Amino acid sequence: MSWFREGIIANPSAFILSLPGLGKSTLIRKMLMGHVAQGHVPIIAGDIKGEYVGFTEQVGGQVITLGHGHGTLNPLDAGALGSVVPILEKHRATLSGHEAQEFDALLERTKEQVHGRQVTMVTALVGLGRKGVVADWESMLISVALREMYDTGRFTWDNPPILQDLIDHLEAGGDTLRAKGRARSDEQWNQRIDELALSLNALMDGAVGRIFAGKTTTPINVNATAVCVDVSAIDSGDDAVKAAVMISCWSAAFGSIEASHLLADAGLGRQRYFAATLDEMWQILSAAPGLVSRIDTLTRTNRTTGLALYQITHTSKDMEALPTEEDRKTAMGFIERAGMVITGGLPVEELDKLTGKLSFSPAEAEMITSWSKGAPPKRSRTRGAKATPPGRGRFMIKPSKDGSPGIPVQTVLFPTEIEYELHDTNKRFEGFFTEGEVSV
């Protein structure tokens, strides 16, 4: 963020590539600590491996756990965005004249934002569940149903409906809904909504379990020093569930960020700045085609949303492996639009693929490829001793894509970080490393 303020980079974002085990997550955690020190709010909206939980707890932040048997997330809860509407309405009552008219327009825009997020979320989740397209008229019925539900007075902006409420309202099928759906009888209406109702019910208790079957257990608190949504409890092989939860996490996180900005714009809160982290992008990108376009939207608008954005993956092969040519081109565009690119150890062929987007001098290329080599195969007789790969913690920062020299850096862990094990992602192997030699 400070480099963006000084005009060193065009937008506050970074794309990080490096082979596994060389310290990408450690680098990002240290950068996020810098954000906390400056008063910014890091948000990890979908921590797939639980690597940011310890950091978030140590800085006094908020950790939200989601997964089978670990909390629920309401897709119709647009983050904190809906909860600001009553605050804005209360402030509107104190205004008059032209000022009141301008505020009315702000209120209307906010309500439409909430509504739009709700329709988009439900439509996206239904599409993921079906692994297919949601018809335009199905989205229309969802939209009309949600407007009617709020008009009844049963629900408020800070007390949104849940999926079961939406299902019940669609099945009841009021006159307006039936007219919009061109249904002239009960039989026609049932035929019209059968597939949609089945898909919505599957979200309540299908592959995703009960994750979406209720109100949001723990809403995101943008006043926290940091926020981590831990989704590591989700089965690592369940791509559809992972994709559905990730989309919901992003919607909640960015809805909360928008809510914070709305209050600041209205003079009802201080301006806050946020740092969003999309780690393990290779898992996210491969989970579903729709996620690529969602990330693309974020990378294009992060400057206007007061947001620093960090995208982390292994190599560009992760993006080349996407199922469609459109997705592959969109994903490679992330590198082109990033304010800076940070590379850890990468093989020669990977640097060749990046040549069209980044320029490396021969010395830089030699340095980066040398970091990709593993530790020499030397056994130690000292219990607990481990050989360290030569490239661990070493990175090249490229703040410009015009051939300007990069900045080689090395991450150094301070005693406090080591004491609290903020960066230890090998805890499962802790006993193994201290057992000494093993006969095979």
Language model region names:
Residues 63-65, 226-228, 341-343:
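Conserved beta-strand scaffold positions in the cores of enzyme catalytic domains, especially
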Residues 5-34, 46-49, 69, 233-369, ...:
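Conserved P-loop NTPase motor cores
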Residues 1, 344-347, 352-440:
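Phosphate-binding and hydrolysis-coupling loops of NTP-dependent motor/remodeling domains
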Residues 22-83:
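Walker A/P-loop NTP-binding active-site region of P-loop NTPases
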Residues 53, 57-60, 78-307, 385-390, ...:
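P-loop NTPase motor domains
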Residues 75-78, 85-86, 155, 238-242, ...:
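Short conserved micro-motifs at the rims of enzyme active sites and ligand-binding pockets
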Residues 14, 43, 227:
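Conserved beta-strand position immediately N-terminal to the Walker
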Residues 1-5, 220:
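Short beta-strand elements
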